């Protein structure tokens, strides 16, 4: 059905211009005897009545806000360079007797209107409006010519009067559309006054596709304590949207104030708050929100007015060592949860910044630092001496192990020395292939001396 409607609309728009004329846009009619003029022109007013004919003296009086009078010979009054303020009735009299009245209307032709149509939500009528660049004259009128197109009832033409709002400085017209209607409209705005008329180009719209909400309202951006890269954003649905029947989806965009590129987030349906997790620390951000019907019906609203906000900034504090520490610059939560996602961020990552010179360091601080240094030096000296003593002991033990065996007879008591290679005693009998091993470390039970090697020293 929608395809048929689109085909019909395209056919109408492709037709000759005559077929798209929705109505006749003409200048407004004026009362008989009214003289019309453009600003800056010269106007001649003629006093009516036979009494004013000939070379008689006629007295003219302007009935407007200004008290002006003229006296002429004959029944004509010439006004040069007339302006809008000259509009009004001019009374002519002869010998203090009123002869007649001549109305003068000075007006500016209307400018060509530029029509725009919208529908705030699926439950209301469509509104077509035009905002002129200058205030129109009081006599300017506007009317909307419309053609309704659907597949069931064909075409129907109608007109809608438009009202001018001094507060909004615009002409507006309402086109009745019932809820659920799926029809096309072709509209054109005619603006006319007593000196001319202009009509807009034809505009076509679909009753559902033209739905466009107002921007979200009451946008608030606030910092979250303890979160140096978070911003909380909240808003409300526009007053012209009833969320009881139709819900809205939202888009949120934000950027640092010095950047021109926005980051855009598409939010779930009916979500009216959001937390930005990747804001730059200590930087003011610009935030905007817009809405659209939950099922993508119609168009996105305009972006809401810009609102700025800065993430939480901790108060710097001075440590006992005289160093200024700003908790905002380093956060356990920030590094654990979010820093891995934004390693390419260009913000500064400095953590500590000295704020006091060494000359201003307090005495307790100096004593603590000096004591720590002295303790460290003493510990190093102790470790070096300990290692040196250990190395010396190991060297002595190694030299004793590699020295030649002591003589068999010594003055003092001997301690047995176990050698890795046993001493060989000369063989007395047996074949050459037999080797007799002496038993190392075996002593005589009655002698305190080791005489197991006597065969080697005293051969038989």
Curated annotation (Swiss-Prot):
Residues 20-364 are extracellular. A motif (WSXWS motif) lies at residues 300-304. Classic and trans-signaling are both inhibited by tocilizumab, a humanized monoclonal antibody that blocks interleukin IL6R signaling. It comes from the Eukaryota. GO terms for molecular function: ciliary neurotrophic factor binding; ciliary neurotrophic factor receptor activity; enzyme binding; interleukin-6 binding; interleukin-6 receptor activity; interleukin-6 receptor binding; protein homodimerization activity. GO terms for biological process: cell surface receptor signaling pathway via STAT; endocrine pancreas development; interleukin-6-mediated signaling pathway; positive regulation of chemokine production; positive regulation of glomerular mesangial cell proliferation; positive regulation of interleukin-6 production; positive regulation of smooth muscle cell proliferation; T-helper 17 cell lineage commitment. Belongs to the type I cytokine receptor family. Type 3 subfamily. This is Interleukin-6 receptor subunit alpha. The gene is Il6ra.
